[in-house]
């Protein structure tokens, strides 16, 4: 398996990985148009996990959220749009992609706080050491805000860093 940044030729496949979850009743062509025009999708950096035959197994989007650090100097990133094709789910590809991407990015810039909004509950991400933020930090009822913090950066349950909590991304 190989981790790499997504290329232009990958985007239709990437977008369709999430059609069942985020299609909201749109036709496939309308859904693709929505994805292609999404500011959120254009502002982040896409990563994919592919097999040795170059088949895309999973994808995710990394957002630089340093604008939330309120001058603390903390490096903050968001992980979003994590998706795997239906027929490849429950085989560990999403977890593998998350771990590899975080490790890859941390080689160049040690990230202090990784945020994500879970649309699938906490269990999947808890296995990857993400913790749900306390209820007073939650900004959505339909998605759970979770964080993975570098040691000694932020104990989610005991203190509050001087940062802004991200809206859904």
What are these regions (language model features)?
Residues 44, 141-145:
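Short hydrophobic/aromatic beta-strand or adjacent loop that forms the aromatic wall/cage
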Residues 48, 54-67, 76-83:
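Conserved beta-strand in the GNAT
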Residues 1-51, 55-57, 152-169:
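Short amphipathic alpha-helix that is part of the acyltransferase structural core
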């Amino acid at each position: 398996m190989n981790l790499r940044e997504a290329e232009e030729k990958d985007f239709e496949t990437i977008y369709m990985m999430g059609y069942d979850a985020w299609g909201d009743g749109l036709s496939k062509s309308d859904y693709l148009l929505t994805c292609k025009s999404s500011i959120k999708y254009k502002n982040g950096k896409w990563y994919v996990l592919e097999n040795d035959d170059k088949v895309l197994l999973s994808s995710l989007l990394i957002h630089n959220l340093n604008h939330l650090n309120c001058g603390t100097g903390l490096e903050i990133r968001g992980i979003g749009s994590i998706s795997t094709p239906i027929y490849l789910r429950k085989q560990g590809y999403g977890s593998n992609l998350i771990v590899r991407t975080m490790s890859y990015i941390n080689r160049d810039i040690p990230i202090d706080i990784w945020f994500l909004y879970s649309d699938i509950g906490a269990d999947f991400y808890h296995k990857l050491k993400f913790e749900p933020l306390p209820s007073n930090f939650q900004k959505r009822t339909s998605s759970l805000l979770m964080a993975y913090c570098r040691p000694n950066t932020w104990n989610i349950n005991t203190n509050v860093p001087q940062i802004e909590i991200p809206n859904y991304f």
